């Protein structure tokens, strides 16, 4: 095993635990160290945290805490939903942000669920026609909501809105101020525990982004560690539930988390076919992403070179 002197120092960003569980497990189980890495996890406010204010979910995505941290060099690598990373890689540099390339399809395949207010009378997706669904704009809950509802509604019938963090959304549902909202864990389990109806749910894959300062061998070592962590989580998720339920601050115990929703896989190269399919889908909605990007301009699978 490498000694402390030989370990390469890496700073990674983590916000919502369910999307970065493989990173947290790899750190705490010593898997990064086994790969010669000294990984520092930098926590940023996420929409799943009870004590997060609305700055983490503001509509101006490049002003959110994660973006500010990355732009100032606080971290060199982060993960978002696949569509969010495409948007960051394409639009970020156009907006004068620190450049970031897509470097992998990530480990987390997080579940998102559309949950209805008990007062709404909504029990099926078709009833969400022209009804605003609360999401984090331009993040996984937004894109996955569009994907899910496309099977039941026309694009022009799908409406989304920003109603704050997931805790704030749940309380707005409870008060009847919203008809529906989209959540990831632990908030899907919290909603189930409290009797809210779940309309539909789907997995949503993360993608990994990195600055040019992160070299291929370092990324490869990170991804090997995360692949091993994914195996451990899938084999026995219970011991790791606490990372996720901590964000709910007492509203959900680790044994109450619906761990069957957790799914992780080894990071893999981001293929041309995957990029083209994802990018073309995003271009089908106004203002989701800027046209004109190419696979060569936004993807760098340097970890596999």
PLM regions and their residue ranges:
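Secondary-structure end/capping motifs
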Residues: 216-289
